[in-house]
Amino acid sequence: MSASIYLVKGREKSLLRRHPWIFSKGIERVQGNPIDGDTVEIYTQDGKWLARGAWSGSSQIRARVWTFDKEETVDLDFFIRRLKYAQESRDGLIKRQGLTGYRLCAAESDGLPGLTIDRYADFLVCQILSAGAEFQRDLITQALRTLYPECSIYERSDVAVRKKEGLKERTGVIYGETPTEPVVIEENGGVKILVDIRNGHKTGFYLDQRDNRQAAAKYTEGKRVLNCFCYTGGFGVYALKGGAKEVVNVDLSQNALDIARQNAELNGLDTSNTQFVRHDVFKLLREYREKGDKFDVIVLDPPKFAESKAQLLGACRGYKDINMLAFQLLAPGGVLLTYSCSGLMEQSLFQKIVADAALDAGRDAQILELLSQASDHPIGTAYPEGFYLKGLVVRAR
């Protein structure tokens, strides 16, 4: 018999709105002795059934909802149904954009809490981030093998958030082949990208920026472009395809820069007007400022500055500093494409930070576009935490 949890009176409101998390302070009592990952029944204080979820005794998020349907059991068929629906909901996008790399499963936003799956050609790369997904790892693997018999499955659960769930980090082959070399994917009608599945950031690449890379290209014709935190050069490739006269790609990782060069060459682009600079972005921007260098287009796509609420204030200072430096380097009429991937950073706050940065740089500016994550990274209407990537296209006078 499965364990049951009963909520503090009033704490059922978020579940009635179909939010998938139950925090430790929202639980009045537990009936039974669930182990981490166990499926538990969730009730109101007075015994009304609400949902069925996964228990995590180590996390502040004490349970994550698998289903709000009392008749739905969490078994192999459950995972096949959820993954099949996730795939079908993306099929139109895949066809329109010619994708061989896409996010197959966006965790809570696809009804599978703690499970992220990206597809790169014939490799499925999984991040298992919750006790519930960890507990169901074998069933998830079986479901993927049923739906994608042609694919190898590789795990990249080397993420610090697992510690909050009482889990150790883990990587390696779950099924099939090891991706010994970078895998080539295509996006946006034929743009080729090399993805280092084993050693790259996240699961290997930033699929969420796909639409924003394409959007950037329309600003680069005949322009001098500075691509900061370039990783493997995605924005740089699109800048060159858009007709940039010069592109400077900057990153701290030499391995990422090497792949960035390969990505440009893979797309048949002339790299004679392209630099691949290994440098700290903050320091380099200050050096450019001291030299009086100017750029027509600057891309700021930094790593996550805030992993927790305690880090948010420091993150705000970091975002303001780097955006101010960028405004100081923009030529008159220049365009800044700036992003935050910190889920804790609300859109309105990010917009205020960028506005304050322009003010401190002494520049009048206009927001031309508000940008977000690609649509294979959906945002559940009951799960606003799924909205994490914010972007602005800003023109400085």
UniProtKB/Swiss-Prot annotation:
InterPro entries: PUA, PUA-like_sf, PUA_sf, RLMI, RlmI-like_PUA, SAM-dep_methyl-trfase, SAM-dependent_MTases_sf. It is found in: Cytoplasm. Transmembrane segments: none annotated. Keywords: Cytoplasm, Methyltransferase, RNA-binding, rRNA processing, S-adenosyl-L-methionine, Transferase. Coiled coil: none annotated. Specifically methylates the cytosine at position 1962 (m5C1962) of 23S rRNA. HAMAP family: 23SrRNA_methyltr_I. PANTHER family: RIBOSOMAL RNA LARGE SUBUNIT METHYLTRANSFERASE (PTHR42873), S-ADENOSYLMETHIONINE-DEPENDENT METHYLTRANSFERASE DOMAIN-CONTAINING PROTEIN (PTHR42873:SF1). This is Ribosomal RNA large subunit methyltransferase I.
